[in-house]
Amino acid sequence: DVIEVSVQNSTPRLVIDAQFNVFTKGESPRLEGGVRLSFSANYFDQEVPMVKDATVVITHLNSGREYPLFYSDSEGLFLPETIDFLTDLHSDYEIKVVHSGQTYIGTTQFIPVPPILKAEQGNKTLFSGDETEIILAFQDFPEREDYYLYDFGQNIYRPIEDRFFQGEAFVFSHFYTSDEVAVGDLITIKAHGVSVAYYDYFNLILSLTDGNGGPFQSLPASSRGNMVNITEPDNYPLGFFFISESDQRQLFIEDLN
C-alpha cells in the first residue's frame, strides 16, 4: 500500500474515511464508524466540504456478494444495513466509491483484536504527581505479527505492535492528566485490531497532529492511504479503508489517596 503524508497546500481531493470498528464480544455485533466522504482541506482551512451524493458499495470478495451503504444525515456517514458480513477472518473486502464520474476502490481484511483482560486504576504517577494511572492487559495472538490501536478517549491514542511480546501477555499503563479526568468520571477504553499499513499510516497522522489524530478528524494534510482511483489514477483519493475487531472496558475514576 502507498502511504504518503504531506502538509503542503494541494488541489482538493476526495477523502474516503472508511473505518469500521466492529465490537464482537457482546450478544450481537455492534458497529462504530462507517464511511465519511469529504474534500481535503489545506493546512489553514477550517471548513471541510462533505460529500453526500456518492454511491458506496462493499463487496465480500470470497462470496462476491455486494452490500450497498446508505447515507445517514444524523450520523453524517454512509452505513450498511447489516454488519454480519464484516467479521469474516477468511475473506478480503473491497469498497467501491463512485462520485462525479470517478470510481475509487480499496481492499482490506477483518483484523482481530485480543479482548482487554484487565482495566483497573493504579496509584503510580509521572511528572506532576497528579496523573491517574490505568493498568491494562491483554494476551497477544501467537505465531503472527499483530498491530493494535488503543483509544483512551479525548483524541488520545496509542498504536501498539507486538514485536517485543509476540504471543505473550502484555501489561502496560496509561496516564491521564488532571485536565483529562477527575474523580467520579466514567472512562471508556477501546482496543482495535489494525493492519501494519494502517499502523504506519496512523503513526504518520499522529506525527502531524501532535498526537491528537483520530478517526474522522479533519486532517490539515494530504494523507494518502490504501484507496486508489481506477478512473483517473493521478486524481488519487486520500483516507483509508479498514475493518477492525474491537473491544472496550469502562471504569469509574476513584480517589485512591
Predicted regions and their residues:
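A sequence/structural signal for flexible, mid-protein segments enriched
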Residues: 1-257
